[in-house]
């Protein structure tokens, strides 16, 4: 039993010895803070906390009536993604792909006449793909992201007890600059 416990402790410390952290900013379709934790040379967890403007294609059902349209929206989201990285033949350049969640708040920029929604909640999934360049001379990483996603919005109209749900497809393009700790 002691040997198993020692083996588990050694394994946990070796995982942390390989771990690398990156912290920085992301701008574009989402603007905010970006953090990345490396589990090994290829697998990482990236979490972004950001505010963004995007075009959403959505349909909304209120009181059994469904409407569909494309509209601009702002959102404030926590966006954690699991990403797998592959080395490219160019030195220090990696391509990555993965997916994750989008959890936060949103509101439409243009409202229909008489529509005055409060800020609504948002939960969804997204894919993520991009390129990352790791600078040799300084501990910086520059990354370009593309993130298409599907989300579900939910909330209430002001002055009403009627709940609404909104199904939306959105996408974001962003650039991140992170410092390697």
What are these regions (language model features)?
Residues 4-13:
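Sec-dependent N-terminal signal peptides
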Residues 13-19:
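Sec/Tat signal peptide C-region and signal peptidase I cleavage site
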Residues 19-31, 44-53, 103, 149:
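Transmembrane beta-strand segments that form the barrel wall of outer-membrane beta-barrel proteins
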Residues 22, 30-34, 75-79, 122-126, ...:
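Transmembrane beta-barrel architecture of outer membranes
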Residues 24, 36-39, 150, 167:
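Short secondary-structure boundary/capping segments within folded domains
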Residues 37-144:
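Gram-negative (and chloroplast) outer-membrane scaffold detector with strong preference
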Residues 43, 54-58, 136-181:
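Predominantly the C-terminal beta-signal and adjacent terminal strand-loop region
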């Amino acid at each position: 039993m002691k040997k198993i416990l020692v083996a588990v402790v050694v394994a946990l410390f070796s995982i942390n010895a390989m771990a690398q952290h990156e912290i920085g900013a992301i701008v574009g379709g989402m603007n905010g803070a970006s953090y990345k934790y490396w589990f090994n040379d290829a697998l990482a967890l990236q979490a972004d906390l950001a505010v963004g403007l995007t075009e959403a294609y959505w349909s909304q059902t209120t009181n059994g009536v469904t409407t569909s349209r494309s509209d601009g929206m702002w959102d404030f989201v926590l966006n954690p993604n699991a990403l797998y990285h592959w080395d490219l033949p160019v030195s220090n350049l990696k391509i990555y792909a993965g997916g994750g969640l989008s959890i936060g708040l949103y509101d439409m920029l243009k409202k229909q006449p008489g529509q005055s929604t409060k800020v609504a909640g948002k939960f969804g999934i997204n894919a993520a793909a991009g390129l990352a360049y790791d600078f040799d001379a300084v501990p910086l990483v520059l990354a370009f992201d593309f993130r298409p996603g599907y989300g579900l919005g939910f909330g209430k109209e002001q002055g009403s007890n009627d709940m609404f749900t909104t199904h939306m497809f959105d996408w974001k393009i962003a650039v991140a600059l992170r410092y390697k700790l």
